[in-house]
Design a protein with these regions (language model features):
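Active-site machinery of serine-nucleophile hydrolases
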Residues: 28-105, 147-156, 161, 248-256, ...
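Conserved hydrolase catalytic core segment
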Residues: 132-148
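Short beta-strand element of the alpha/beta-hydrolase
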Residues: 16-28
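A short loop-to-beta-strand scaffold at the N-terminal edge of the catalytic core in hydrolase folds
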Residues: 1-13, 20-21, 98
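Gly/Ala-rich beta-loop-alpha elbow adjacent to hydrolase catalytic centers
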Residues: 122-126, 130
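C-terminal catalytic histidine-bearing segment of alpha/beta-hydrolase fold enzymes
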Residues: 216, 228-229, 245-288
Length: 288
């Protein structure tokens, strides 16, 4: 690997007893160690700690003082799948390609022969990663019999795969003269970066529609702390819970065959532990 990871098992050596992989992505604070603990706590809460390999990648920025051989990203770039910094090692890599590599290792039967399912999740900024990665990942084509799900928890924004946004109860195309970049990557599919741009739009749409995506939102997540309030973000709704509900209405209207599932955690706000360790959160991660 070309970035630090926290993991319960060696990915290169594997483990014949492991049946499930849980990849958990940190938020804007990049506290991968805390998210690693959250993932392990969640697995233990349902009695799966022995059979689950928990992996928490650490997407570093320059402020993390990365080692000379470790890639790092801008504070927004890692969330969006951008290439690593030009000031770091070469070749530059997308943050999303790091997740591809983790999935490739987990799904390799010579490493984890009993593994049958991988869950990729993130909360807040990590939730942004999870939703956009679900749309653009190429790793699923190499999974064989291993199934994949994505749990998107309380992100600030989502990826929209059409130009319409909800306005006063109806989906319309916004006035681009007022918000010219509202449909650019990472809000939409225009001006995609290197990783997302390697796929044509129709492929991205098809992947996001058919993949198993759980939209995990806390109904008390209505504050503006660390919320993206750019015009492109505000066109998705006033706060995180509202934005999640709108995204689901968007998918229902334009892609009724979608495989997104809305899962609302009552009385929980912007808390990764509150979300993941709730009954609904555990079901999103480990249920059917």
């Amino acid at each position: 690997m070309y970035l630090p990871i926290f993991t319960t098992h060696s990915l290169s050596e594997g483990n014949p007893q492991v049946t499930r992989g849980l990849i958990i992505v940190h938020g804007a604070n990049r506290n991968a160690d805390d998210y690693f603990k959250r993932g392990f706590q969640a697995a233990a809460a349902v009695g799966h700690q022995e059979a689950t390999v928990v992996v928490a990648p650490h997407f570093q920025t320059s402020s993390d003082n990365p080692a000379s051989d470790e890639l790092f990203w801008s504070s927004s770039g890692w969330k969006r799948g951008h290439l690593s910094s030009t000031e770091g090692p070469r070749p530059r890599r997308s943050s999303y390609s790091a997740i591809d590599q983790i999935i490739d290792l987990l799904s390799d039967p010579s490493h984890f022969p009993a593994l049958t399912e991988i869950t990729m999740t993130g909360h807040s900024a990590g939730g942004q990663v999870a939703h956009r990665y679900a749309a653009t990942s190429r790793a699923e084509k190499n999974l064989g019999p291993v199934t994949m799900r994505y749990v998107v928890a309380n992100p600030s924004t989502y990826l929209y795969i059409r130009q319409e946004r909800e306005n006063t109860g109806a989906f319309v195309v916004p006035d681009a003269s007022v918000c010219s970049d509202y449909d650019d990557w990472h809000y939409g599919l225009s001006e995609r970066n290197t990783y997302a741009g390697a796929l044509v739009v129709d492929t991205i749409k098809a992947q996001l529609v058919r993949r198993d995506v759980r939209i995990l939102i806390g109904d008390a997540d209505s504050l503006s702390a660390s919320l993206d309030v750019s015009c492109g973000a505000n066109l998705q709704g006033p706060y995180r819970f509202s934005r999640g509900r709108r995204l689901m209405r968007f998918m229902d209207q334009f892609f009724p065959e979608h495989s997104h599932k809305e899962m609302v955690v009552p009385n929980v706000g912007h808390s990764s532990s509150g979300m993941y360790l709730s009954a609904i959160g555990l079901d999103a991660l480990f249920g059917t």
